[in-house]
């Protein structure tokens, strides 16, 4: 049984926290996840372990899930993690332009499982439903970048979720803060899956891979390639990532329970295994477990 440290999981409970997009259909969320009407309103550790039972999960990276009160949600997740035998590292939500950023980081610092923060930076110039940032230019905004100074003081890593056309702005940021670890989510989120889109995505990722303080997460396959994705379709993209970042900076994640709207945990991880079957056992262990476990280790 393969040992796994899942690099991207959402655990939540609509009775404990408010997730508006789960109470009423949200067109923006639907634009990336498709029809999510069957997504559960409660998904806890035991639900995840049932879904992943065919694999030996040693730990997970819990990601905030668009709650109305991110601090309340983080405290709830901390309690959930403490009550479980499963190691749980946490990535929480911030706004780097928030005047109260320092206060929020102080609060997060009291939660031992919090190892990273993220802000939703995605801005699709061609689709107004996929504009999750305040503005399209945050990565180049000097005031926004100053928020990273506060992050550095607290020792948190920084999650980066954006769309592939924004990738070219990222290396300037990661080079400016070489002592902050940056995690690029959703494979750099390619929007254009055509041959020319692939070429541009690979070019921009290759530049970013030269920054040793960046790791990349391979997850949310269903959001990129659709609910009916095929292994043959996703393999070149995944293998390109590993070629550029190497096994020690590449990590697999499930994106459960959203992945459950597609093929589910077992078939997803089976596909991952088939795609990287030619790598050595040590290299596979890095991608499935060791990279995420080390990158998201407790502060």
Kindly give the residue locations of the regions a language model identified.
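A generic "structured core" feature
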Residues: 3-16, 133, 142-143, 147, ...
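Acidic-and-aromatic substrate-binding clefts and catalytic sites of carbohydrate-active enzymes
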Residues: 39, 66-72, 94-102, 162-168, ...
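Mid-to-C-terminal alpha-helical segments outside catalytic/metal-binding sites
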Residues: 2-7, 14-51, 59, 239-240, ...
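A general structural detector for well-ordered alpha-helical segments in enzyme core domains, enriched
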Residues: 47-51, 73-80, 101-108, 143-150, ...
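Divalent metal-dependent hydrolysis catalytic cores, especially in the metallo-beta-lactamase
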Residues: 27-41, 47-68, 87-95, 115-122, ...
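Active-site gating/metal-coordination segments in enzymes
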Residues: 72-164, 217-221, 228
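Conserved, mostly hydrophobic/aromatic
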Residues: 8, 60, 90, 117, ...
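Catalytic pocket-lining loop regions of alpha/beta-barrel enzymes
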Residues: 134-251
């Amino acid at each position: 049984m393969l040992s796994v440290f899942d690099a991207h999981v959402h655990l939540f409970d609509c009775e404990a926290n408010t997730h508006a997009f789960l109470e009423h259909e949200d067109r923006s969320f639907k634009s990336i996840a498709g029809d999510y009407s069957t997504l559960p309103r409660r998904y806890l550790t035991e639900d995840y372990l049932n879904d992943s039972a065919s694999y030996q999960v040693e730990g997970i990276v819990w990601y905030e899930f668009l709650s109305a009160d991110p601090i309340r949600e983080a405290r709830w997740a901390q309690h959930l993690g403490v009550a479980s035998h499963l190691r749980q590292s946490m990535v929480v939500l911030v706004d780097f332009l928030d005047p109260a950023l320092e206060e929020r980081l102080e609060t997060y610092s009291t939660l031992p499982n919090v190892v990273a923060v993220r802000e939703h930076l995605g801005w699709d110039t061609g689709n107004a439903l996929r504009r999750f940032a305040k503005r399209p230019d945050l990565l180049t905004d000097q005031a926004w970048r100053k928020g990273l100074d506060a992050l550095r003081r607290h020792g948190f890593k920084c999650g980066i979720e954006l769309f592939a056309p924004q990738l070219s702005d990222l290396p300037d940021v990661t080079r400016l803060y070489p002592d902050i670890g940056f995690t690029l989510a959703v494979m750099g989120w390619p929007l254009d899956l055509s041959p020319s889109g692939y070429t541009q995505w690979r070019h921009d990722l290759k530049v970013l891979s030269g920054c040793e303080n960046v790791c990349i997460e391979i997850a949310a396959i269903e959001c990129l390639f659709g609910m009916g994705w095929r292994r043959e379709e996703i393999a070149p993209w995944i293998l390109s990532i590993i070629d550029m970042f190497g096994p020690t900076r590449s990590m697999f994640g499930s994106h459960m329970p959203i992945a459950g709207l597609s093929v589910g945990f077992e078939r997803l991880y089976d596909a991952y295994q088939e795609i990287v079957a030619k790598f050595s056992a040590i290299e596979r262990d890095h991608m499935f477990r060791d990279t995420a476990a080390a990158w998201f280790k407790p502060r």
